[in-house]
Amino acid sequence: MSIECHNAFILHRRPYRETSQLIDLFCQDVGKVSLVYKGGRSSTRMRRGTAQPFTLLQVSYFGRGSLKTVKSFEAQTQVVPLVGQRLFLAMYINELLYRLLQAETACDGLFECYQQTLLAIAGAVDPQIALRLFELTLIETLGYGVNFSEDIYSGELIESGYEYQYQHQAGFFAKQAIHKQHDVYSGQDILALAQRDFSNQNVLKSAKRFCRQALANLLGGKPLHSRALFTAK
């Protein structure tokens, strides 16, 4: 029996049969993995509370096919302290990964970015910058990053004094006169996005709008449950 061992975070879990759980993990070396955690809902394991979201775990598992079986969990760190809206933000990034990652596909650098983002959300005065950086990294990792420096049609450099529109999976191009104002980005904001410079609140708002547009397309227009929880507060 071949046993694999990886650092991982729990993305999603749900009841399975009488005492077990189905768990989706984000593993450092192999990406998203789905497992059966036998007895995971038993009173003994619930009391131990090892397999908790937002905790760096070392997991060992075995099996073939798309659904593996957990052998053991071991916590490597304490649970990242997340409460209130910060907890909802962490749930949001978990749902993004759960929905968008392909099974057992390694994502170079994304695991470390996720771990750093959890810590930043927990400790930052304003967690929005950490959230935008994570979203941008996720979009790039999935292969849908765009060039924030050039007009996709003319090939000319983006200029701070001009306005541009965004085309999904392609990039930015000079604004057309008939386009709605709320779909327009200033060249100044686009260039700041290229540098990940969020010192200006207008840039941060543009980053949120861009990420929401890009992710909505990747999600197929289906709403995120965690976002509904967050906006309800």
Curated annotation (Swiss-Prot):
Which NCBIfam families does the annotation name?
reco
Ranges in coiled-coil conformation:
none
**Where on the tree of life does the source sit, at the highest rank?**
Bacteria
What is the documented function of this protein?
A: Involved in DNA repair and RecF pathway recombination.
Underlying gene: recO
Keywords noted in UniProt: DNA damage, DNA recombination, DNA repair
Tell me the InterPro entries matching this sequence: ARFGAP/RecO (IPR037278), DNA_rep/recomb_RecO_N (IPR022572), NA-bd_OB-fold (IPR012340), RecO (IPR003717), RecO_C (IPR042242)
Q: Which GO terms describe its cellular component?
A: bacterial nucleoid
Cross-referenced Gene3D superfamilies? Nucleic acid-binding proteins (2.40.50.140), Recombination protein O, C-terminal domain (1.20.1440.120)
This chain's protein is named DNA repair protein RecO
- Give the signal peptide range: none
What family name appears in the similarity comment?
Answer: Belongs to the RecO family.
Listed transmembrane segments: none
Which BP terms from GO are recorded? Answer: DNA recombination; double-strand break repair
SUPFAM superfamilies in alphabetical order: ArfGap/RecO-like zinc finger (SSF57863), Nucleic acid-binding proteins (SSF50249)
**Organism (species):** Psychromonas ingrahamii (strain DSM 17664 / CCUG 51855 / 37)
